[in-house]
């Protein structure tokens, strides 16, 4: 398990709530998840 990836996602979720830009954050999370799957 890559704990750094989960930590990054948690930070992204917190950032989404703080700046209210959930669409951009979700796009970043999806991109990060795809990168995690392929690498």
Swiss-Prot record:
Induction: Expressed in both exponential and stationary phase; expression is higher in exponential phase (at protein level). It is a single-pass membrane protein. It is found in: Cell inner membrane. GO terms for cellular component: plasma membrane. The keyword NAD does not apply. The chain crosses the membrane at residues 13-35. Pfam families: YkiC (PF23686). The keyword Oxidoreductase does not apply. Keywords: Cell inner membrane, Cell membrane, Membrane, Transmembrane, Transmembrane helix. This is Protein YkiC. It comes from Escherichia coli (strain K12).
């Amino acid at each position: 398990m890559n704990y750094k990836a989960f930590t990054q996602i948690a930070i992204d979720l917190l950032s989404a709530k703080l700046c209210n830009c959930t669409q951009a954050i979700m796009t970043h999370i999806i991109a990060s998840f795809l990168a995690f799957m392929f690498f």
